[in-house]
Design a protein with these regions (language model features):
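Active-site metal-coordination/substrate-binding segment of hydrolases
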Residues: 7-31, 45, 49-60
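Glycine-rich, mobile lid/loop segments that gate access to catalytic sites or pores
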Residues: 40-139, 150-157
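Alpha-helical support elements that line or immediately flank enzyme active sites
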Residues: 28-49, 83-97, 197-215, 256, ...
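Terminal-appendage/accessory-domain detector
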Residues: 1-25, 121-134, 141-372
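Short glycine-/small-residue-rich flexible loop motifs, especially phosphate/cofactor-binding loops
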Residues: 37, 65, 89, 172, ...
Length: 372
């Protein structure tokens, strides 16, 4: 069923913390794209329809997030709060719902929001976009069948903005110049080079820069100090490999130890390996509380030298584009686990020509099969 497919793919899309990140962060891809794909596969819709639905879902989700940013409770995880409406908007576009049906879909989705940031670093965090995608599909299907909800759920008393943000929603951001520009282009998004929280990207790249510049290995380093902002966890060692995706210490240790940070860097086996335990003991994090400053990595070497390097705008961030070779390395890190070279190449060619795919099931039939 498309609701189950959207749920599963929403989880898969977020569990590695590898998807692109908008501004402010809200995980629009793992909330909206699975909704659109699930319905389009069943209905045999085109790639162009997927693109339109994805852009629209991203737009609605991003506008709501930006409009309530100053009032958002940090205990709520953004894809759980905004994703169901983004998923509903994307689903409504795929199904071709009319104005009234779309209002109903958004009203239904608004009653299905939720997700707590206390679950960061655990498996349940990834269910927030999964639930968003599933609820988006379900809301649109229910609305199409005549299910009703408030037609003013965003602004009405005891509605979405009132309940979740104490009414503090900037409506100019929500509806101003709607359709004149699109948030997926402006302000755009970051592409993560590494499968970890976005706040880990600068620390990882700073350590890799340092390691490569001076030809370092973990054995050469007595202590590694990272001066960074207050974003991301630190101070306690990750309980699992998955938890390491949100730990400055672990991400830095992984970069120093292996000279790369990939999907396999975050297994439990890797987390509790003797080499990782030894390297983690060398990492020290100093917080400066400033988000805008670059991350500075300084290594005190066993031979007495002290060397430093930094990263302030990681590769893949807006303004520092990721080249094709690095993007493809990221793709193959993901696909090589399930697709052989031939299937993977076919998938890439189809995705790069998405707007000309007549039936999206052509693509889905490839990526849903294990060929290795």
């Amino acid at each position: 069923h498309p609701t189950n497919a959207a749920f599963a793919n929403g989880i898969f899309g977020h569990c590695l913390d590898y998807e692109i990140q908008g501004f402010p962060p809200t995980h629009g891809t793992s909330s909206c794209l699975p909704s659109a794909l699930a319905l389009a596969e069943v209905g045999k819709y085109s790639g162009q329809k997927i693109i339109e639905a994805y852009v629209l879902g991203w737009e609605i989700q991003g506008r709501l997030r930006a409009a309530s940013f100053s009032a958002a409770n940090p205990a709520f995880h953004p894809p759980g709060m905004f994703g169901p409406l983004g998923g509903a908007a994307a689903s409504a576009k795929v199904l071709g719902l009319d104005t009234h049906q779309t209002q109903m879909a958004l009203g239904i989705a608004a009653s299905r929001t939720g997700g707590l940031t206390a679950n960061t670093g655990t498996m349940v965090k990834s269910t927030h976009p999964g639930n968003a995608a599933r609820m988006g599909v379900e809301a649109a299907l229910l609305a199409r069948s005549g299910y009703t909800a408030s037609d003013a759920i965003l602004e009405t008393s005891r509605g979405y903005a009132d309940a979740l943000f104490d009414g503090n929603m900037d409506w100019d951001i929500v509806i101003g110049e709607l359709g004149a520009s699109y948030r997926i282009s402006d302000p755009g998004f970051d592409i993560k080079r590494f499968p970890a929280q976005v706040y880990m990207q600068n620390p990882i790249e700073a350590v890799l820069n340092l390691r490569n510049k001076y030809g370092l290995t973990a054995d050469m380093v007595q202590e590694l100090v990272l001066k960074t902002s207050g974003r991301g966890h630190s101070g306690s060692l990750p309980k699992t490999g998955l938890d390491g995706k949100f730990s400055v210490e672990y991400c830095a240790a992984s970069a120093l130890l292996d000279g790369e940070v990939v999907i396999d860097s975050f297994t439990d086996y890797k987390r509790f390996s003797p080499a990782m335990e030894q390297t983690l003991n060398k990492i020290k994090v100093e917080r400066d509380g400033l988000d805008s400053d670059p991350v500075v990595a300084t290594a005190l070497l066993r031979d007495g030298r002290s060397v430093s390097d930094e990263c302030g705008k990681f590769t893949g961030s807006a303004g520092n584009p990721m080249g094709h070779q690095l993007r493809m390395a990221k793709v193959w890190d993901c696909t090589s686990r399930v697709l052989d070279d031939s299937s993977g190449t076919t998938m890439v060619n189809l995705v790069e020509d998405m707007e000309n795919i007549g039936d999206i099931s052509t693509l889905m039939s490839i990526i849903s099969q294990k060929t290795v």
